[in-house]
């Protein structure tokens, strides 16, 4: 019985470690533009996301009618881990896009080791640009994408992802 409890404890403890730590733990300052090109450090598609994260995501498929072609059906993939969610949109033609997300868990790591729990100072040190940190919310806006970083008590508390396309 003790052996089973020990094994379960180990599985829970090591259940969500990043697979590719060397690619993420760079800590050399990068520009906001470089960050927004590949915020996860890999292509933003379902296969890459599944292969490059080790969190035990629950995946749910949601069907949606294509607004331009109502006879066609697209699919939204919802990846859930605890209170965090990442959504991918897959068109009827097979194109995939990172649609949206909310990250509330430190085990979901973005490029340059940006993650929930990071101090404001360490967050600023990850970027070569001067960041306007006058408030507890910072938005990084790129071509068709917006990342909102929300701080509480000088620690990164939440990351919101909003991508838009037509």
Describe these PLM feature segments:
Residues 1-25:
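Bacterial Sec-dependent N-terminal signal peptides
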Residues 17-136, 155-166:
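Short helix/turn-capping signatures at newly exposed starts of structured segments
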Residues 3, 10-11, 132-133, 138-142:
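N-terminal leader/targeting segments
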Residues 137-155:
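Short, exposed beta-strand-loop hairpins at the edges of beta-sheets
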